Amino acid sequence: MDRGAPSRERIAELAGGEPLLAVSDLRAGYGKMEILHGVDLMLAAGRSLCMIGPNGAGKSTVLHSIYGFTRITSGSVRIGGEDVTRLSPNEKLRRSGIAYVLQDNSSFPDMTVEENLWMGGYLLDQPWQAKEAAERVFEKYPRLANRRSQPARVLSGGERRLLEISRALVMEPRVLLVDEPSIGLEPRYIEMVFEMLVELQRGAGKAIVMVEQNAKKGLQFADVGYVLVAGSVARVGSGADLLQDPEIGRLYLGG
């Protein structure tokens, strides 16, 4: 693991191959307040990255900025070498293959599970495309298929999380941004959610960028870990290396 501000060469090395997602010297924030101060991030397809750090470090703001929810003052976001920095969130989802699973409960409680999945395809040209995508989800996740006609409000917290991630898959993204996937979940549902993410990364080749308050679980999952402090990347390393670092353990892992 690198100590001190990591070099771009080290960040590129940890990407795990040709970067699918490349964030370069990103400065961004909300209104007149700059939250991110020159963030670099790279990740190849089929790889995972978890950001940890203290509250207010800017972790979720990195996801917001990649997706287009912040005011970017300088730097760039590239997908497969194409500059997508100024694209709207809808354009990033439809054209560039970036999907975002929000931290807060984002399912529609009075819609059925099936209808929630259809909503994930709101940018598709034809309604039947979303319906076909929903059927593919049901084939892969029988737990949701068994609930397809029930309103989302009757789902457990873990099932809602599966639904939210599945809805993001309807547009067949290449990059999946996931904000706090374990928050508020019982341990058995945390395992279920992370099993799904592992399959999406290793089986479907998605690049997954995650913020996770359960730092130990996030680093166990991720190929790469970034530590953010005060809007900057302070440390980088493999997830395994960060887990073994005594200082990281003391500050973020309860060790």
Regions found by a protein language model. Name each.
Residues 67:
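Helix-to-loop junction immediately C-terminal to a conserved catalytic motif
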Residues 52-54:
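The feature captures the beta-strand-to-loop junction immediately N-terminal to the Walker
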Residues 191-204:
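Helical segment within the ABC ATPase nucleotide-binding domain
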Residues 151-155:
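Conserved ABC ATPase signature
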Residues 71, 83-99, 104, 127-134, ...:
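ABC ATPase NBD coupling module
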Residues 168-169:
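ABC ATPase C-loop
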Residues 31, 111-132, 140-142, 237, ...:
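ABC-type ATPase nucleotide-binding domains, specifically the catalytic core motifs of the NBD
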Residues 1-27:
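ABC-family P-loop ATPase nucleotide-binding domain
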